[in-house]
Amino acid sequence: MLRRLVGPLGSGATSALSRGSLRRVSTTPASLKRFPPKQGLYDAALEKDSCGVGMVASLKAEPSHKIVADANTMLVRMSHRGGCGSEPNSGDGAGILTGVPDAFLRRIQPGLPAAGEYGVGNLFFPNNPEAVAKCKAIFEKHIDELGLQLVAWRTLPVDNSALGPTSLESEPAIEQLLVAGRPGAMSGRELNRELWRLRILASAEVRADAAMEDFYVCSLHTGTVVYKGQLTPEQVWGYFLDLQQPDYMSHLALVHSRFSTNTFPSWSRAQPFRALCHNGEINTLRGNKNQMRSREASLVSAALGDSLANLLPITSNDMSDSGNFDAVAELLIHAGDRQIHEAVMMMVPEAWQNKDMPPDR
C-alpha cells in the first residue's frame, strides 16, 4: 500500500506527528467523486436525511481535553445513527465542532494574537497543488481587501489509512487558515462578521471556476472550529491527528453522525456546519429557499450597509437542507447582529395556537 507524508504540525509537535501524516493514494475511478445527475428514481430535489447529534460542555466554560475525548466517545456510540454504503469504511459523514484550541495553536504557531483576536478555519481544496495555490491566492487577496491579516496556512495532518475507496477517492486536500484582525482595532463579534464576509466573497470567486467544485470552507471563526468529513463516526478521531493532542482543549464539543438516506454523501455535506448541526428533514425546503431568494432584494443591514448585496445569494442548491438552514442562521447572526438563539427562534418559532403571537413572547 502506497503512503506519502503530509502536514507536519511544526517543531513543537510530538515526534510521531512532526513526521507528518499517512495519506494513501487512491485507485478508485474518478466518477465516484461527482454528485450523480438526476436519473431513474434519484432526484437531488427529493433528498431527505436523518442523523445523530450530541454535545458535551463545561458549565463553567473551562476548556479541557477530556471534553473533546468524551465527545468522541459519544460520537462513536452514535454509529447506529449514521450510515454507509456497501463499503463499511466509507461513511455518510461525521464530525466535531469545538472551541478554538488556543493553547494547542500557540504551541504549533508561536506569536498568535490574543484569544478572540484571530480566527481559525479548516478548508477543503481540490486535491492537486496547482488548485490549492490558486485558492490560497484568492483568499489572500480578499484578506488584504478586507483589511485583515494573514497569520499562517497550515497543512492539516491526517491519517487516511482507514478510509474506504469512495471516501478516499473524494478526499480533499485540507488546509488550516489563521487570520487576524487589524491590531487593536478588531476582535470578537466585529472580527467574526469580517471572517464571514471573507469566507463568502472568497468562496464565490473560487467556485466560479467549475474545476474548483471540491472547494469548501468548513468554518472560519474566532470561537469555534469544525473537523469533519465523509467519514464514519469511528474514523474521525484517527483521521484528524490534531484531536488526539493532549493540549487540544475545549469548553464544548458538538458532534454529528450523518445518515444520508437519499442524500448523496460528500465531504462538504458532513456536519457540524459552521453555526449548528441538524437532525431531521425540512420537508418544505424548496418553498423555504424560494421565499428566501424572493426576500433578498429587500434585505437591509445596518452592520453591512451596501456590502450586503455582494454576499448574496444566501442559499444554494449545492447544500443540503441543513446546510441552507445554517447559512440563513449565519445571515441573521452576522448581518442582523443577533445571538444564535435569537436566530434559531426566528427560523423555528415555537408552536402557537392563535393567529398572532405577542411580541414579548
Language-model regions: role of each:
Residues 1-17:
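N-terminal chloroplast transit peptides
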Residues 2, 19-361:
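Conserved short alpha-helical segments that host acidic/polar catalytic motifs at enzyme active sites
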